[in-house]
Amino acid sequence: MAELNLKGNRRVLTGVVVSDKADKTIVVRCETLVKHSLYKKYIRRHTKFMAHDPSNECGIGDKVQIVEFRPLSRRKRWHLDKILEKAV
């Protein structure tokens, strides 16, 4: 699930790394639960964020925490905060 916290004025998200092919960039998939307005059933929604990984330490499947940052490129506005769990 995507946990949304505020770190000062910056948003903090938790997700899973789905790609680490680009240099110093990871793609993080963040899932969230949304309640359907008519059927009252919870539905999983996901969003992908590109995040800056300065030391290329993340791998596919790692659970990470990312924090909102200044724009680094057209799609990169997030920065790797910490690795919560390494993939096996």
Swiss-Prot record:
CDD domains: Ribosomal_uS17. GO terms for biological process: translation. InterPro entries: NA-bd_OB-fold, Ribosomal_uS17, Ribosomal_uS17_bact/chlr, Ribosomal_uS17_CS. PROSITE patterns: RIBOSOMAL_S17 (PS00056). The keyword Ribonucleoprotein applies. GO terms for molecular function: rRNA binding; structural constituent of ribosome. SUPFAM superfamilies: Nucleic acid-binding proteins. One of the primary rRNA binding proteins, it binds specifically to the 5'-end of 16S ribosomal RNA. Part of the 30S ribosomal subunit. Belongs to the universal ribosomal protein uS17 family. This is Small ribosomal subunit protein uS17. It comes from Maridesulfovibrio salexigens (strain ATCC 14822 / DSM 2638 / NCIMB 8403 / VKM B-1763) (Desulfovibrio salexigens).
